[in-house]
Amino acid sequence: MKKIDKRKKYVLVIDVETANTIIDSKFNDGLVYDIGFGVYDKKGNEYVAKSWTIKEIFDKEEELMQSAYYAWKLPRYYEELKNGTRQTMTIKGAKKYIAKVMETYNITEVYAYNAKFDKQTLDNTIRFVTKSKERYFFPYGTEIKDIWNMACCVLCTQKTFLKQNIRNDKGNFITNAERVFGYISCQSDFEEDHIGLQDVRIEAQILAKCFAQHKHMETNPYHANWRLPRKKYEEMVA
């Protein structure tokens, strides 16, 4: 860990990869098998970076793991575990470790791209493993903030982004982390790794770019702002 400058404000950026159960298709019932997180200041400087596979899911739920959206990446995980470049942690151990890091850096804000997903699946996992004896992954009072909403407010409404006019089949602008990082880094063919820590570092740079705009941003993970770019574009060409 770098020396802590107590004059700075630090935030935690987290990203998870999940496998899906079939408990209830009406809500997100994914369970986390990969956690990556880092501690950053508002300029995107990194102070802590960690990544784990979660033992109770990755090691003990073999059938479930085959449902993982990126199951084809599993051989990479096995190789990294074998050569020692990746570690395994229990979900309770991960929770305790992250809480300690947050205490050390006086962190009260956790950021993620589509943060509702990360929070829900982390809570799902701690409840699944502890049989609901523990119900929440982050310490009480933690503010969960959404980088996606922030990016939609201040990056994806920029004229240069809108003029690129990259949309999905429904006519909405593509605003996922892969697309936004490609935009701010001028890499039109950028592809996200979809491995916890690697994605964290990308999302931390998007977050820093958002902060650098010095504009009002929506951070609530339960408010959807992905329609904003289309609305802004329609105003621009009217």
Question: Which residues make up each language-model segment?
Answer:
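Short, polar/flexible loop-turn hinges at active-site or ligand-entry regions and domain interfaces
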Residues: L81-T85, S132-F138, Q187-E192
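Acidic, Mg2+-coordinating catalytic module of metal-dependent nucleases/exonucleases
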Residues: E109-K116, Q120-T121, K163-A238
